[in-house]
UniProtKB/Swiss-Prot annotation:
Its main location: secreted. GO terms for molecular function: serine-type endopeptidase activity; signaling receptor binding. Keywords: Secreted. This is Serine proteinase-like BMK-CBP. One of its GO terms (biological process) is proteolysis. Residues 1-40 form the Peptidase S1 domain. It is found in: Secreted. The active site is at residue 40. One of its GO terms (cellular component) is extracellular region. Belongs to the peptidase S1 family. The keyword Secreted applies.
Length: 40
């Protein structure tokens, strides 16, 4: 993201990051049990 800024911890509590050594992916909490991610 060009021109973006870092978010503070807790600023977007519905956002999720899945950060593994092989890849990183983002998601969004849609309930207390489920995370919605892109299919890639």
């Amino acid at each position: 993201i060009f021109g973006g800024t870092f978010a503070k911890n807790g600023e977007y509590p519905w956002m999720v990051v899945i950060d593994l050594p092989e890849f990183a992916c983002g998601g969004v909490l849609i309930s207390k049990k489920f995370v919605l991610t892109a299919a890639h």
